[in-house]
């Protein structure tokens, strides 16, 4: 089978009415799956449905009550939800429009042309154009293709992985990466103040300012997710339930719904909120705050009639030079014990990967004991 045939886009374009069994989710997951468009319409029509908080952070730039209210609103959302719709983010609409247009133009190219940027996870090359071909802990594949690469700092990026076509892709991605880096600092300041800490605390901890000789910048990884039309959205997912390893994740989309977050024991569909971007709290920030801010469990659904694209920027600490552990000031009164052992970001990623592999082995063993075939 060629690389082109392995892409989910090719499978979708083939006109299949059923999906291969490797994409069919385990039976226990299917009860609340469905078409992303239909679930979003139902959520919008039901005022009683839980709604992800919307916070305008432009008030943070002012003194007085507005600034304090902004900090409190972000704090509450990060503690109770782990996800926020951010308005007043300062990202110009024309930049976001150009970014979306460039990503859509890349994924509109023939698959064979996109293959020039193909990654090779088996060889350790994670960046580039790819599909989630390796089975997850569930033993199933995800209904998505993607483009993934470092977008900031620019001097560390491998620009050979940035598409030359469309020509706009490189300049607008570079511009966007720099702007999100500025936004990340602002949000980390707000989140620090929400904990009663000096506003530079969380960023200093993520960049290693507390360690002698260490002052690395945060790394921003851009992933464009492409979710093709799926004939059976009641059986498949674009991205299975997970938390992000990052400190913060920033999400834009093409207007097609699909994001769901887990809150108060159930899945909540993210409603369209014009003019906002979605921000997730990730594992690294949950560790630093000793669980005060919640790394949100989320997933991506697919649709029978619409293609969904999302642009996700993962804001991460340097992989090995920074030790992630709860901020000491949050433990100072002795009332709280550290919930997380110290680890580097690289160690945390490896730990999550090991746990997934162990889950896969346990699932395989259980299936084998029941006389089922395993992959």
UniProtKB/Swiss-Prot annotation:
Pathway: Pigment biosynthesis; anthocyanin biosynthesis
Entry keyword Transport: no
GO MF annotation terms: 2-oxoglutarate-dependent dioxygenase activity; L-ascorbic acid binding; leucocyanidin oxygenase activity; metal ion binding
InterPro entries: DIOX_N, IPNS-like_FE2OG_OXY, IPNS-like_sf, Iron_ascorbate_oxido_reductase, Oxoglu/Fe-dep_dioxygenase_dom
Pfam families from the UniProt entry: 2OG-FeII_Oxy, DIOX_N
Induction section of the entry: Induced by light.
Role: Involved in anthocyanin and protoanthocyanidin biosynthesis by catalyzing the oxidation of leucoanthocyanidins into anthocyanidins.
Sequence ranges assigned to domain Fe2OG dioxygenase in this UniProt record: 218-317
GO biological process, one term: anthocyanin-containing compound biosynthetic process
Binding site for 2-oxoglutarate: 308
Superkingdom of origin: Eukaryota
Keyword set, alphabetical order: Dioxygenase, Flavonoid biosynthesis, Iron, Metal-binding, Oxidoreductase, Vitamin C
Top-rank EC class of the record's enzyme: oxidoreductase
Catalysed reaction, written as an equation: a (2R,3S,4S)-leucoanthocyanidin + 2-oxoglutarate + O2 = a 4-H-anthocyanidin with a 3-hydroxy group + succinate + CO2 + 2 H2O
Cofactor: record remark: Binds 1 ascorbate molecule per subunit.
Protein name, as recorded: Leucoanthocyanidin dioxygenase 1
Annotated family: Belongs to the iron/ascorbate-dependent oxidoreductase family.
Required co-factors: L-ascorbate; Fe(2+)
UniProt EC number: 1.14.20.4
Record-listed Fe cation binding positions: 242, 244, 298
């Amino acid at each position: 089978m060629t690389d082109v045939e392995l892409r989910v886009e090719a499978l979708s374009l083939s006109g299949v009415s059923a999906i291969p069994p490797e994409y069919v989710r385990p039976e226990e997951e299917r009860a609340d799956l469905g078409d992303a468009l239909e679930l979003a319409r139902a959520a919008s029509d039901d005022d009683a449905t839980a709604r992800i908080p919307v916070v305008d952070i432009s008030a943070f730039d002012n003194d007085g009550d507005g600034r304090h209210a902004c900090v409190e609103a972000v704090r509450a959302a990060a503690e109770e939800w782990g996800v926020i719709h951010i308005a007043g983010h300062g990202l110009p609409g024309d930049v976001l429009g150009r970014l979306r247009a460039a990503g859509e133009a890349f994924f509109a190219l023939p698959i064979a042309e996109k293959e020039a940027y193909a990654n090779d996870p088996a060889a350790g090359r994670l960046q580039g154009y790819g599909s989630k071909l390796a089975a997850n802990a569930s033993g199933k594949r995800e209904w998505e293709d993607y483009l993934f690469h470092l977008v900031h700092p620019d001097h560390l990026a491998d620009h050979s992985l940035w598409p030359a076509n469309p020509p706009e892709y490189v300049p607008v991605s570079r511009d966007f990466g720099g702007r999100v880096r500025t936004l990340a600092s602002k949000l980390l300041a707000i989140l620090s103040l929400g904990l009663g800490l000096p506003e530079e605390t969380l960023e200093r901890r993520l960049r290693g300012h507390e360690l002698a000789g260490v002052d690395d910048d945060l790394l921003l990884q851009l992933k464009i997710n492409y979710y093709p039309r799926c004939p059976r959205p009641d059986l498949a997912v674009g991205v299975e339930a997970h938390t992000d390893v990052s400190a913060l994740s920033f999400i834009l989309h093409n207007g097609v719904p699909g994001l769901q977050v887990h809150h108060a024991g159930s899945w909540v569909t993210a409603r369209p909120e014009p003019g906002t971007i979605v921000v997730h709290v990730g594992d690294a920030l949950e560790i630093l705050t000793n669980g005060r801010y919640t790394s949100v469990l989320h997933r991506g659904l697919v649709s029978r009639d619409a293609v969904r694209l999302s642009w996700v920027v993962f804001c991460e600490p340097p992989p090995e030079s920074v030790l992630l552990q709860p901020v000491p000031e949050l433990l100072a009164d002795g009332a709280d014990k550290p919930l997380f052992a110290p680890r580097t970001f690289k160690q945390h990623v490896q730990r999550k990967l090991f746990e997934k592999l162990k889950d896969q082995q346990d699932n395989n063993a259980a299936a084998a004991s029941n006389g089922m075939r395993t992959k």
